[in-house]
Amino acid sequence: AASDVYKRQRGGLKLDHACDVFGLDLTGKVCADIGASTGGFTQCMLEHGAEFVYAVDVGHGQLDESLCNDSRVKNCEGVNARYLTANFFDRPVQFISGDLSFISLKLVIKSLCDCLCDGGEMVLLIKPQFEAGKQALNKKGIVKDRKDHVRVITELLGCFRAEGLAAEKITISPVKGGDGNLEYLILLKNADMTADKLGQLNIKEFVNEAFDSFKD
């Protein structure tokens, strides 16, 4: 359906932006797209030279047919990211993307970290609407208060570092979430903390910049 194509393209735009801004090279890499849905991120990885992509989603029958038929893609349906382990994959995963809804990244980061090989990289979409708590949402499901965005990013950075992931870079997603929420993309590395470049990040300034960039 046309709406599926649109959804896939929107997803692809987000990871495409991350590849550009973060200077990612996926050439020849084995990747996992967690929360694959229609496959926007999977498609993007292939376009950026990925050798193989595991398209993982808790749902069924969502992945675009062209990707289902692609020998470089394994469609892993009905898989809950919370319970993923490295054993699930028959090859070491060098790059993970995460575009998850209705669940906090705090609940899946341990599993994702376990699945990523040493030195591997991860790009996660931070969605404040699934992190901030119900009290932070307005009637339309939007997290309007900048303070809540600052809190979400601060807490997640602590959570990622506690799992031994170095937070390298963060950027604003070029498109809002389907519900109209501002979202962020973060690059994490399964490496020692010398790779952590966000220790000096002024999160409040970064959030203000994000809000200002979407002012009409």
What are the language-model segments listed below?
Residues K106-E121:
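A short glycine-rich, Lys/Arg-flanked "PGG" loop and its adjoining helix->strand segment in the class I
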Residues L182-D216:
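Flexible, glycine-/basic-rich loop-and-beta segments that form/coincide
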Residues D20-T27, F89-D90:
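Glycine-rich helix-loop-beta junction characteristic of Rossmann-like nucleotide cofactor-binding loops
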Residues T27-S37:
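Conserved class I S-adenosyl-L-methionine
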Residues P128-K144:
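Short, glycine-/aromatic-enriched active-site segment of Class I SAM-dependent methyltransferases
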Residues Y54-I103, L107:
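S-adenosyl-L-methionine
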Residues A1-Y6:
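Short, small-residue-biased leader/transition segments that mark boundaries at the very start
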Residues T38-G49:
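Conserved SAM-binding loop of SAM-dependent methyltransferases across substrates and taxa
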